[in-house]
UniProtKB/Swiss-Prot annotation:
Active-site residues from the entry: 239
E.C. no: 1.8.4.8
Catalysed reactions listed for this entry: [thioredoxin]-disulfide + sulfite + adenosine 3',5'-bisphosphate + 2 H(+) = [thioredoxin]-dithiol + 3'-phosphoadenylyl sulfate
Annotated keywords: Cytoplasm, Oxidoreductase
Organism lineage: Bacteria, Pseudomonadati, Pseudomonadota, Gammaproteobacteria, Enterobacterales
Family affiliation: Belongs to the PAPS reductase family. CysH subfamily.
CDD domains, per the entry: PAPS_reductase
Principal location: cytoplasm
Descriptive protein name: Phosphoadenosine 5'-phosphosulfate reductase
Natural source organism: Salmonella paratyphi A (strain AKU_12601)
One Gene Ontology molecular-function label: phosphoadenylyl-sulfate reductase (thioredoxin) activity
Top-level lineage group: Bacteria
Location in or out of the cell: Cytoplasm
Family annotation (InterPro entries): PAPS/APS_Rdtase (IPR004511), PAPS_reduct_dom (IPR002500), PAPS_reductase_CysH (IPR011800), Rossmann-like_a/b/a_fold (IPR014729)
EC top class named in words: oxidoreductase
Length: 244
């Protein structure tokens, strides 16, 4: 697999970019997660960053990528509405894995947003999308720009939702290469990796949460629910970071 030209690919229409990366993706599908990270570091341009929501299985990608690329900037977009257990988990993993954590937030505080717009998450899909744009998308765009990122690693998996079921290992999003090393892992592989390396699930896992975001848009799993139905009242799965 030869080195890819990000500028040239960005000039192509989205469909043509997908086609241009098809052969590379076919080869990446045959590699292990660790090999995919190593390939990206050798063949894709820096600077390199890793994003994490510090969700249920976040320790996997944080450990895997950081072991191969120590001190890689880890981007967290903090809404200010995470569970207390989530903030404790962030502190724990940052210390345990010696993460180079970079926290980005909206320009307006949560209280100021509520004063201006009300509780956006209670205002249907449009309100949720505006909330995500303010608290997730804009801070992430700012992070990628300030960190001069050209290659972005993330821990998405196809098994997590229908919206992720057909994602490739390598794509271009927000003008940078996006690499998903564990995209084809199932829950069993995740569990085995955590056990092998002495890592833990998010503390809310034991309380019945399959996916964790903000306190006001996250529900415990109940029988008959798909994982994606536990977020955003089942109206949508993605927070905006991994769309577009």
């Amino acid at each position: 697999m030869s080195q890819l030209d990000l500028n040239a690919l960005n000039e192509l229409p989205k469909v043509d970019r997908v086609l241009a990366l098809a052969e590379t993706n076919a080869q990446l599908e045959t590699l292990t997660a660790e090999e995919r990270v190593a390939w990206a570091l050798e063949n894709l341009p820096g600077e390199y960053v890793l994003s994490s929501s510090f969700g249920i299985q976040a320790a996997v990608s944080l450990h895997l990528v950081n072991q191969i690329r120590p001190d890689i900037p880890v981007i967290l977009t903090d809404t200010g509405y995470l569970f207390p257990e989530a903030y404790q988990f962030i502190d724990e993993l940052t210390d345990k894995l010696k993460l180079n954590l970079k926290v980005y937030r909206a320009g307006e505080s949560p209280a100021w947003q509520e004063a201006r717009y009300g509780k956006l998450w209670e205002q249907g899909v449009e309100g949720i999308e505006k909330y995500n744009e303010i608290n997730k998308v804009e801070p992430m765009n700012r992070a990628l720009k300030e960190l001069n990122a050209q290659t972005w690693f993330a821990g998405l998996r196809r098994e997590q939702s229908g919206s992720r079921a057909h994602l490739p290992v390598l794509a271009i999003q927000r003008g940078v290469f996006k690499v998903l090393p564990i995209i084809d892992w199932d829950n069993r592989t995740v569990y085995q990796y955590l056990q092998k390396h002495g890592l833990k699930y998010h503390p809310l896992w034991d309380q019945g949460y399959l996916s964790v975001g903000d306190t006001h848009t996250t529900r415990k799993w109940e029988p008959g629910m798909a994982e994606e139905e536990t977020r955003f009242f089942g109206l949508k799965r993605e927070c905006g970071l991994h769309e577009g």
